[in-house]
Amino acid sequence: MAQFDVRNTSEGALVIDCQSNLLRHLNTRLVVPLLPADEFEVVARRLNPLFTIEGTDYVMYTQFAATLAVSQLGEVMMNLDDHSLIIVGALDVLVTGV
């Protein structure tokens, strides 16, 4: 498992794994859901960045961050490491407001 992997959950949701690779030995992961952009409102641009996954636009709904058991995560679809500053920035907005 790698930080910023995009995965399906056992319930069919799409999530970004935001947990540090240094903590990969844990049996849980901090994830943020990716919700279809045409169905969910962007509350704040820095809090809710947009990503295109397999030709579809998704909103990172940072305010819905949660932990899931590793067993609830499916195969890796892609990795968003190239967007790490945007993802970490969204988490910073959630935690610090900045």
Predicted ranges, named:
Residues 1, 17, 73-77:
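Residues at structural and domain junctions
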Residues 54-98:
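C-terminal terminal-subdomain/extension
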Residues 3-12, 16-49:
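Compact nucleic-acid interaction/catalytic patches
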